[in-house]
Amino acid sequence: MQTRTTPGAMLKAMREKPPLVQCITNYVAMNIAANVLLAAGASPAMVHAAEEAGEFAAIASALTINIGTLSTQWIDGMQAAAKAATSAGKPWVLDPVAHYATAFRRNAVAELLALKPTIIRGNASEIIALAGGESRGQGVDSRDPVEQAEGSARWLAERQRAVVAVTGAVDFVTDGERAVRIEGGSALMPQVTALGCSLTCLVGAFAATAPEDIFGATVAALSTFAIAGEEAALGAAGPGSFSWRFLDALAALDAETLDARARISAA
């Protein structure tokens, strides 16, 4: 993997100096996203009001924007925060949840893309549609395999000059030049609502820890998530027990275990 340090080293650095991550995420995801960041060692702040989102983004270590439960007022806050983060040189992550579903969502995402996100994280259907392709997404769920979105991700990364992460059974990360696949996780993960949204927040935490290596930070976040998912699945009876086991596994994951178990290959 062509990064400047290992996922484990980034995880250790994050815990030694916890980043403050502003998460503008949806109502469904707020609780689990905050708990995922706490378990990983970061500090969450769920600040989305237009009256303060921009001001807060200037002092946060990173910003994440998820359009899951969208409204005009939320869009104002998202845009203010994205502009402030960019002006302050802070990394920010865009999660374009089901942006293809309505004109309202498509327009909101187009405006956010113009503000140059550092990282774009989505499922295969979202990334394919974002690149102008025809996706088979149904609501917030992807009906396209990750490998089908790899070309779209490369194109989008080059066009936006951003790192693009496509998450699914096997994750794919590219900056338009480099690309890797990340194996791991569990089939139970899609059965826990908003777990993927919480991954977007974790990507922001790693980006804040290693802003000089955004590609490596994104790979580290996805690897951390995958290994925690594998560990949580051991002994889980179903999605309910998996959800709390996931937080425990994430909190218990150490740098050495992460580096030993991460399965990252060039793509």
From Swiss-Prot:
Catalyzes the phosphorylation of the hydroxyl group of 4-methyl-5-beta-hydroxyethylthiazole (THZ). This is Hydroxyethylthiazole kinase. GO terms for molecular function: ATP binding; hydroxyethylthiazole kinase activity; magnesium ion binding. The keyword Transferase applies. NCBIfam families: PRK09355.1 (NF006830), thiM (TIGR00694). Its cofactor is Mg(2+). SUPFAM superfamilies: Ribokinase-like (SSF53613). InterPro entries: Hyethyz_kinase, Ribokinase-like. Pathway: Cofactor biosynthesis; thiamine diphosphate biosynthesis; 4-methyl-5-(2-phosphoethyl)-thiazole from 5-(2-hydroxyethyl)-4-methylthiazole: step 1/1. It catalyses: 5-(2-hydroxyethyl)-4-methylthiazole + ATP = 4-methyl-5-(2-phosphooxyethyl)-thiazole + ADP + H(+). Its EC number is 2.7.1.50. Belongs to the Thz kinase family. Substrate binds at M46, A194. GO terms for biological process: thiamine biosynthetic process; thiamine diphosphate biosynthetic process. It comes from Rhizobium johnstonii (strain DSM 114642 / LMG 32736 / 3841). It comes from the Bacteria. ATP binds at R121, T167. Keywords: ATP-binding, Kinase, Magnesium, Metal-binding, Nucleotide-binding, Plasmid, Thiamine biosynthesis, Transferase.
